[in-house]
Amino acid sequence: IQVVRDLLGIGIDRLVVGTRALDSPEWLMELCGEFPGKIVVGIDADNGKVAVKGWTSVSSRTAIDFAKEIQKANPIAIVFTDIEKDGMLQGPNFSSIKDFAMNVDVPVIASGGITSLEDVKQLSRFPVEGMIIGKALYTGNILLSEAIKICKNETSSEMHNGTT
Protein backbone atom coordinates (compact mmCIF):
# COMPACT_ATOMS: atom_id res chain seq x y z
CA ILE A 1 0.00 0.00 0.00
CA GLN A 2 2.94 2.32 0.57
CA VAL A 3 3.86 2.11 -3.13
CA VAL A 4 0.32 3.17 -4.06
CA ARG A 5 0.50 6.00 -1.54
CA ASP A 6 3.80 7.15 -3.06
CA LEU A 7 2.50 6.99 -6.64
CA LEU A 8 -0.65 8.92 -5.83
CA GLY A 9 1.46 11.35 -3.83
CA ILE A 10 3.47 12.36 -6.90
CA GLY A 11 0.32 13.30 -8.78
CA ILE A 12 -0.93 10.15 -10.46
CA ASP A 13 -4.70 10.53 -10.68
CA ARG A 14 -5.78 6.89 -10.94
CA LEU A 15 -3.95 3.62 -10.50
CA VAL A 16 -4.84 0.36 -12.27
CA VAL A 17 -4.33 -2.86 -10.30
CA GLY A 18 -4.68 -6.37 -11.70
CA THR A 19 -3.65 -9.82 -10.48
CA ARG A 20 -3.22 -8.79 -6.85
CA ALA A 21 -6.89 -7.73 -6.74
CA LEU A 22 -7.88 -11.27 -7.71
CA ASP A 23 -5.40 -12.92 -5.35
CA SER A 24 -6.11 -10.66 -2.38
CA PRO A 25 -9.63 -9.20 -2.15
CA GLU A 26 -8.82 -7.88 1.36
CA TRP A 27 -5.96 -5.85 -0.10
CA LEU A 28 -8.28 -4.38 -2.73
CA MET A 29 -10.86 -3.47 -0.07
CA GLU A 30 -8.17 -1.75 1.99
CA LEU A 31 -6.76 0.02 -1.07
CA CYS A 32 -10.12 1.34 -2.27
CA GLY A 33 -11.01 2.37 1.28
CA GLU A 34 -7.81 4.33 1.76
CA PHE A 35 -7.82 5.87 -1.73
CA PRO A 36 -11.48 6.39 -2.73
CA GLY A 37 -11.96 7.39 -6.35
CA LYS A 38 -8.38 6.52 -7.25
CA ILE A 39 -8.30 2.75 -7.84
CA VAL A 40 -9.21 1.07 -11.13
CA VAL A 41 -9.22 -2.72 -11.44
CA GLY A 42 -7.95 -4.24 -14.67
CA ILE A 43 -9.74 -7.43 -15.64
CA ASP A 44 -8.23 -9.27 -18.58
CA ALA A 45 -10.47 -11.96 -20.04
CA ASP A 46 -9.69 -14.99 -22.18
CA ASN A 47 -12.89 -16.67 -23.37
CA GLY A 48 -14.72 -15.01 -20.50
CA LYS A 49 -12.30 -16.25 -17.82
CA VAL A 50 -9.95 -13.99 -15.85
CA ALA A 51 -6.37 -14.08 -17.14
CA VAL A 52 -3.67 -13.16 -14.63
CA LYS A 53 0.08 -12.75 -14.24
CA GLY A 54 0.60 -11.03 -17.56
CA TRP A 55 -1.84 -13.33 -19.33
CA THR A 56 0.30 -16.39 -18.53
CA SER A 57 -2.39 -18.05 -16.43
CA VAL A 58 -6.17 -18.26 -16.79
CA SER A 59 -8.33 -18.52 -13.68
CA SER A 60 -11.42 -20.68 -13.41
CA ARG A 61 -13.41 -17.55 -12.44
CA THR A 62 -15.41 -15.70 -15.02
CA ALA A 63 -14.67 -12.03 -15.55
CA ILE A 64 -18.28 -11.12 -14.71
CA ASP A 65 -18.27 -13.12 -11.46
CA PHE A 66 -14.98 -11.54 -10.42
CA ALA A 67 -16.28 -8.05 -11.25
CA LYS A 68 -19.39 -8.66 -9.15
CA GLU A 69 -17.21 -9.79 -6.24
CA ILE A 70 -15.00 -6.70 -6.31
CA GLN A 71 -17.90 -4.24 -6.62
CA LYS A 72 -18.15 -4.12 -2.82
CA ALA A 73 -14.59 -2.69 -2.70
CA ASN A 74 -15.94 0.25 -4.74
CA PRO A 75 -13.22 0.78 -7.34
CA ILE A 76 -13.73 3.89 -9.49
CA ALA A 77 -13.83 1.74 -12.67
CA ILE A 78 -12.91 -1.56 -14.28
CA VAL A 79 -10.77 -1.78 -17.41
CA PHE A 80 -12.12 -4.82 -19.25
CA THR A 81 -9.69 -6.23 -21.82
CA ASP A 82 -10.54 -9.09 -24.14
CA ILE A 83 -7.01 -10.46 -24.57
CA GLU A 84 -7.90 -12.46 -27.67
CA LYS A 85 -8.42 -9.15 -29.49
CA ASP A 86 -5.85 -6.90 -27.82
CA GLY A 87 -3.28 -5.55 -30.27
CA MET A 88 -4.60 -7.64 -33.17
CA LEU A 89 -6.28 -4.82 -35.15
CA GLN A 90 -9.20 -7.17 -35.87
CA GLY A 91 -11.91 -5.25 -34.05
CA PRO A 92 -13.17 -5.71 -30.50
CA ASN A 93 -15.35 -8.53 -29.23
CA PHE A 94 -18.48 -6.38 -29.05
CA SER A 95 -20.70 -9.05 -27.52
CA SER A 96 -18.19 -9.79 -24.76
CA ILE A 97 -17.76 -6.10 -23.90
CA LYS A 98 -21.49 -5.40 -23.93
CA ASP A 99 -22.29 -8.49 -21.85
CA PHE A 100 -19.64 -7.56 -19.29
CA ALA A 101 -20.71 -3.90 -19.05
CA MET A 102 -24.39 -4.77 -18.70
CA ASN A 103 -23.73 -7.23 -15.87
CA VAL A 104 -21.63 -5.12 -13.51
CA ASP A 105 -22.43 -2.02 -11.47
CA VAL A 106 -19.00 -0.39 -11.76
CA PRO A 107 -18.16 1.92 -14.68
CA VAL A 108 -16.43 -0.08 -17.42
CA ILE A 109 -13.62 1.05 -19.70
CA ALA A 110 -13.45 -1.16 -22.81
CA SER A 111 -10.09 -2.33 -24.10
CA GLY A 112 -8.82 -4.74 -26.70
CA GLY A 113 -9.02 -4.73 -30.47
CA ILE A 114 -10.39 -1.25 -31.14
CA THR A 115 -9.25 -0.77 -34.72
CA SER A 116 -11.37 1.80 -36.51
CA LEU A 117 -13.54 4.85 -36.02
CA GLU A 118 -16.52 2.57 -36.67
CA ASP A 119 -15.46 0.49 -33.64
CA VAL A 120 -15.28 3.70 -31.59
CA LYS A 121 -18.74 4.72 -32.79
CA GLN A 122 -20.27 1.35 -31.93
CA LEU A 123 -18.61 1.18 -28.49
CA SER A 124 -19.69 4.74 -27.69
CA ARG A 125 -23.28 3.45 -27.81
CA PHE A 126 -22.54 0.75 -25.23
CA PRO A 127 -22.90 1.21 -21.46
CA VAL A 128 -19.18 1.90 -21.09
CA GLU A 129 -17.48 4.84 -19.42
CA GLY A 130 -14.69 4.96 -21.96
CA MET A 131 -12.32 2.97 -24.12
CA ILE A 132 -8.61 2.40 -24.49
CA ILE A 133 -7.25 2.65 -28.01
CA GLY A 134 -3.69 1.43 -28.34
CA LYS A 135 -2.16 -0.01 -31.47
CA ALA A 136 -4.68 1.69 -33.79
CA LEU A 137 -3.35 5.08 -32.65
CA TYR A 138 0.26 4.06 -33.26
CA THR A 139 -0.48 2.69 -36.73
CA GLY A 140 -2.56 5.73 -37.68
CA ASN A 141 -5.76 3.69 -38.17
CA ILE A 142 -7.46 6.05 -35.72
CA LEU A 143 -6.81 9.74 -35.17
CA LEU A 144 -7.42 10.64 -31.54
CA SER A 145 -9.15 13.90 -32.47
CA GLU A 146 -11.64 12.02 -34.68
CA ALA A 147 -12.34 9.42 -31.98
CA ILE A 148 -13.01 12.17 -29.43
CA LYS A 149 -15.32 13.93 -31.87
CA ILE A 150 -17.31 10.72 -32.42
CA CYS A 151 -17.68 10.10 -28.68
CA LYS A 152 -18.81 13.67 -28.05
CA ASN A 153 -21.35 13.45 -30.87
CA GLU A 154 -22.74 10.12 -29.65
CA THR A 155 -23.05 11.39 -26.07
CA SER A 156 -24.70 14.59 -27.24
CA SER A 157 -27.22 12.79 -29.47
CA GLU A 158 -28.09 10.33 -26.69
CA MET A 159 -28.75 13.21 -24.32
CA HIS A 160 -30.99 14.92 -26.87
CA ASN A 161 -32.86 11.69 -27.55
CA GLY A 162 -33.36 11.04 -23.84
CA THR A 163 -31.54 7.71 -23.89
CA THR A 164 -29.04 8.41 -21.11
Task: Annotate each language-model stretch with its function.
Residues 45, 84, 92, 114-118:
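Short beta->alpha linker loops
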Residues 2-86:
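Conserved anion-binding
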Residues 22, 113-114, 138:
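Short, surface-exposed acidic/glycine-rich loop or hinge patches that mediate macromolecular interfaces
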Residues 87-89, 117-120, 139-142:
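Short active-site-adjacent structural elements
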Residues 27-34, 124-164:
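C-terminal helical cap(s) of enzyme catalytic domains, especially alpha/beta-barrels
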Residues 1-11, 27, 95-133, 147:
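Catalytic cores of alpha/beta
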Residues 56-77, 91-105, 109, 114:
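Short loop-to-alpha-helix "cap/lid" segments that border enzyme active sites
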